[in-house]
From Swiss-Prot:
This is Large ribosomal subunit protein uL13. Gene3D superfamilies: Ribosomal protein L13. InterPro entries: Ribosomal_uL13 (IPR005822), Ribosomal_uL13_bac-type (IPR005823), Ribosomal_uL13_CS (IPR023563), Ribosomal_uL13_sf (IPR036899). GO terms for molecular function: mRNA binding; structural constituent of ribosome. Belongs to the universal ribosomal protein uL13 family. The gene is rplM. Part of the 50S ribosomal subunit. It comes from the Bacteria. GO terms for cellular component: cytosolic large ribosomal subunit. This protein is one of the early assembly proteins of the 50S ribosomal subunit, although it is not seen to bind rRNA by itself. It is important during the early stages of 50S assembly. Keywords: Ribonucleoprotein, Ribosomal protein.
């Protein structure tokens, strides 16, 4: 019997909506990253994007444990000398709560073109309203 390999054109992708309210950031991000990769499916193939679409709502209500809300720092660099910027978790969650979840999930995906394709299937929104109702996403409990 030959080993099964999923073909990109035959992969069936579902849409799921995840409510981030009260969820721990890391535990939420690991489950989302696993679903984006397709590791929950029996036809998972490492070199093929077999994952589903994930819509995350209530991103501003995600929580972190311990003193991370004040101690966790996000760094970015412009590429120019002295161009490093930093922002704390508290300030980032107030300014752009979507970026907190996006950054956590992106760090858990492969760092290659396939990982970038997987990342594009993640949709994160600030409130409880999202524009993907036409796709009829199923609720995913994490």
């Amino acid at each position: 019997m030959k080993t099964f390999t999923a073909k990109p054109e035959t992969v069936k992708r579902d849409w799921y909506v995840v409510d981030a309210a009260g969820q721990t950031l890391g535990r939420l991000a690991t489950e989302i990253a696993s679903r984006l990769r397709g590791k929950h499916k029996p036809e998972y193939t490492p070199h093929v994007d077999t994952g589903d679409y994930i819509v995350v709502i209530n991103a501003e209500q995600v929580r972190v444990t311990g003193a991370k809300s004040s101690d966790k720092i996000y760094y970015s660099h412009s590429g120019f000398p002295g161009g490093i910027k930093s922002i704390s978790f508290e300030k980032l969650i107030a300014k752009a709560p979507e970026r907190v979840i996006e950054t956590a999930v992106k760090g858990m995906l492969p760092k290659n073109p396939l990982g970038r394709d997987m990342y594009r299937k993640l949709k994160v929104y600030k409130g409880a309203v999202h524009p993907h109702t036409a796709q009829q996403p199923q609720e995913l409990k994490i």
